[in-house]
Amino acid sequence: MQTDAVWNLLAEQIEHGWDESLPKPAPNPDDLYRPTLIGAWSKNRLVGGAFVMPDSQDAKAFTSIGADKAAQAFERSCCMIQGVAVAAEHRREGIGLKIKRCCDLWAAQHDACIVLSIPTNAAAARMNEKAGYDVLPPQVALCVEVTDDDRGIVCCFPMGGDVPDSRWAFHIVAQPQWAPLAIGQCHMTGSGGRYDDHAIGWMYRADIMP
């Protein structure tokens, strides 16, 4: 099946950052906003692929502090690219960049407004920049504020140190539809991942569509 081919390519080609705990998405013939595999084909051969999904994993940070409405708005607004891969014999052909843009389009068509990605090396970071992403420095936390009942709720997501070059990248693909959002960055300190609200450098802020 095509889904198996895309899944196997991602598992084989992604050296760092592939989350093996994630289940393989089922086929999505109705194109719903749920975990989805995207394949790039040339002459009936798979040349690249991507795995996109609502960012349900990071939404749990809002749920953990009792902000259920903010968690729902975050998950509905933020699309996570879990991985992009290109077949070895088709690298340096611009396929990865085209796949990234396809992921952005998929997110926007499903009413998400932010696409998140985690480049794990300098080459991947450059590709994200070419695709229009804001790329944070390595090991810097991504901070997201979701407005819930006129109260801004902030969660910061540190970057694990297992892969030193890992960094957050984000791209604004539409105006928020579910809740006002802001995105920023900060350095988190201590074993508990503490941060100072005043130390967050906000980079993007937008209200919902009228």
Where are the regions a protein language model picked out?
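Short secondary-structure junctions
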Residues: 134-138
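Conserved beta-strand-loop-alpha-helix junction that forms the acyl-donor binding cleft
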Residues: 116-129, 139-146
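Short amphipathic alpha-helix that is part of the acyltransferase structural core
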Residues: 1-46, 153-154, 167-175, 183
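Extended low-polarity, hydrophobic cluster-rich segments
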Residues: 78-80, 102, 106, 114-116, ...
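Conserved acyl-donor/pantetheine-binding loop and adjacent beta-alpha core of acyl/acetyltransferases
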Residues: 20-21, 27-41, 45-83, 145-152, ...
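Short, high-confidence coil segments that cap the C-terminus of an alpha-helix
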Residues: 35, 110-112
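Conserved acetyl-CoA-binding loop-helix of GNAT-fold acetyltransferases
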Residues: 86, 92-105, 130
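C-terminal "cap" of GNAT-fold acetyltransferases
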Residues: 141-210
